[in-house]
Design a protein with these regions (language model features):
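Conserved ABC ATPase signature
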Residues: 124-128, 132-134
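Non-catalytic connector elements of ABC transporters
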Residues: 4-38, 45-48, 60, 231-233, ...
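Catalytic Walker B motif of ABC-type/P-loop ATPase nucleotide-binding domains
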Residues: 149-153
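Conserved ABC ATPase "signature" region
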Residues: 59-64, 105-120, 172
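ABC ATPase NBD coupling module
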Residues: 61-79, 215
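A short, proline-enriched helix->beta-strand linker immediately N-terminal to the Walker B motif
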Residues: 143-147
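Internal alpha/beta loop-helix hairpins
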Residues: 185-249
Length: 343
């Protein structure tokens, strides 16, 4: 459980975070420079907010009014940095046990075995792979029995194959970890896979918070739609209570019920378009192909619209075979339920 109400003036903006999440697997998603890592540093006690309070798992870590500021070493937090912060002059074993008392050091062999590091325990960090370095960092953190885990872009330096395997290992570890884990990332896949709840931030402000799967399903804001992978976003204008115009695409879209007020844009995910051969009713787009990118398991079609802004249509393998057989469709169609209404 994370309860944050803090302000902190940074170079380009003021970080203002106010949230209360009743979950112990929390993700913070945002673009570069949005303030994600600063939130973790404040939780860990590395940085001090200008005002407010921080409470994690019921423990008050910081409160500017009550003059509470628990020292970083007393917060019992395990912090996994992007580069893992291994000491280059120490071996794998020495990196794990550094600063531990003799009783804790006796557990080192168990952690080496648990993380598959026994064979490289005498190697220096420059002699091990990125995946091995990630496991060393996790062993070093967990041997200290932290109450909370913080991950700051911890997997971003790994290639896709290694990242997938390390994340699977982390997910397995977290099943037995009773405390909270907070992940900062710009990777939507990582947040979706590992986090029950999430915060989306932009320039130091929260744009979305809540259940991870619900936010991906209905992001509600342009910022969240972009960060969760929506490639097609257009500003809109209302025509009437159930019709709007997508200004960037030059197309009118009809809805079966009254549209909510306050919508400024819509989004359509690239895989939510359906090809149409011949005449069709509903929300359709004229199909004028600009270019195509062939990928190993899918194709990306870039469609020229009347409004001037291209649309991306993602075509999976089964649909690729149909298009090869029938040729390009006459139109693209989108179901009303797949149109994201955004503020």
């Amino acid at each position: 459980m994370l309860e944050l109400n803090v302000k902190n003036k940074l170079n380009n903006f003021t970080l203002e975070i106010n949230c209360n999440l009743n979950s112990n697997r929390i993700g913070i998603l945002g673009g570069s420079g949005a303030g994600k890592s600063m939130i973790l540093k404040m939780i860990a006690g590395i940085e001090k907010p200008d005002s407010g309070y921080i409470k994690l798992d019921g423990k008050l870590l910081f409160d500017s009014q009550k003059k509470i500021d628990i020292k970083p070493q007393d917060r019992h937090i395990g912090y996994c940095f992007q580069n893992y912060a291994l000491f280059p002059h120490l071996s794998v074993y020495e990196n794990i046990i550094i600063g531990l008392d003799n009783k804790s050091k006796s557990l080192a062999d168990n952690f080496l075995e648990k993380f598959g590091l026994t064979q490289i325990k005498d190697a220096k960090p420059n002699r091990i792979s990125g995946g091995q370095a990630a496991r060393v960092a996790m062993a070093r953190i967990l041997i200290r029995k932290p109450e909370v885990l913080l991950f700051d872009e911890a997997f971003s330096a790994l290639d896709i194959y290694l990242r997938d395997h390390i994340q699977e290992e982390i997910a397995s570890i977290l099943k037995d970890f009773e405390g909270s884990a907070v992940f900062v990332s710009h990777s939507r896949d990582e947040i979706y896979r590992l986090c029950e709840s999430m915060i989306v931030i932009d320039s130091g402000k929260i744009t979305n918070l809540g259940n991870t799967k619900e936010i991906f399903k209905n992001p509600k804001t342009k910022n969240a739609a972009i960060l969760t992978g929506c490639k097609n976003i257009s500003d809109i204008r209302y025509i009437d209570d159930s019709t709007l115009e997508a200004l960037d695409w030059g197309v009118k879209l009809n809805f079966s019920s009254k549209l909510p007020k306050g919508i400024s844009a819509i989004g359509i995910r690239a895989h939510d378009f359906h090809p149409v051969w011949g005449k069709s009713e509903g929300n359709i787009f004229e199909f004028r192909l600009k270019s195509k990118a062939k990928l190993p398991f899918e194709d990306n079609y870039y469609i020229k619209t009347c409004g001037g802004q291209d649309i991306t249509w993602l075509v999976q393998r089964d649909m690729k075979e149909l298009i090869e057989k029938k040729g390009l469709p006459d139109f693209l169609k989108v179901d009303e339920k797949d149109i994201l209404l955004l503020k």
